[in-house]
């Protein structure tokens, strides 16, 4: 088992310097490799989208990292208002990604469990 699995895991909101790593995660699968543009420098559209996410109180872009500050994965949460239960929020979990170095070690499950508790 990878040593990183047992280290402290930190879930935090993404910051602008994370954008290249997030795009790299998004591009690292069959579909993402066809739709994402992971070329340095990144297109401004990624930075514009990030700013829109940050400014929207119903959006959270989350990073999972270990105590060595290695990015293990990411996800986006969208909070959607609804009327049932006298009004409230439900969340949509999307763009869950795990770095290929950490796949097959249970991190995707940890990300989803964290998001559900959130």
Where does each model-flagged region fall?
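Glycine-rich phosphate/pyrophosphate-binding loop shared by adenosine-nucleotide-utilizing enzymes
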Residues: 9, 69-74, 91
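A short beta-loop-alpha structural element at the N-terminal edge
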Residues: 10-24
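Conserved GNAT-fold acetyl-CoA-binding loop/helix
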Residues: 27-49
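A short helix-loop-beta-strand connector motif used in the catalytic cores of GNAT acetyltransferases and
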Residues: 51-63, 92
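Conserved beta-strand in the GNAT
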Residues: 63, 70-79, 97
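A short, internal acetyl-CoA/4′-phosphopantetheine-binding micro-motif in the GNAT/acyltransferase core
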Residues: 65, 81, 93-103
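Conserved donor-binding loop and adjoining core beta-sheet/short helix segment
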Residues: 75-94
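Conserved acetyl-CoA pyrophosphate-binding loop and the N-cap/start of the following alpha-helix
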Residues: 102, 106-114
């Amino acid at each position: 088992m990878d040593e990183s699995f047992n280290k402290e895991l930190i879930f935090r909101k993404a910051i602008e310097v994370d954008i290249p790593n997030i795009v790299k995660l998004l591009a690292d699968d069959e579909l993402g490799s066809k739709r994402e543009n992971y070329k340095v420098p990144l297109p401004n559209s990624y930075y514009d989208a990030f700013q829109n996410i940050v400014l929207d109180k119903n959006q959270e872009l989350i990073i999972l990292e270990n105590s060595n500050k290695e990015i293990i994965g990411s996800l986006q949460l969208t909070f959607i208002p609804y009327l049932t239960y006298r009004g409230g929020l439900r969340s949509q979990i999307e763009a869950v990604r795990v770095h290929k170095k950490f796949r097959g070690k249970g991190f995707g499950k940890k990300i989803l469990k964290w998001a559900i508790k959130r």
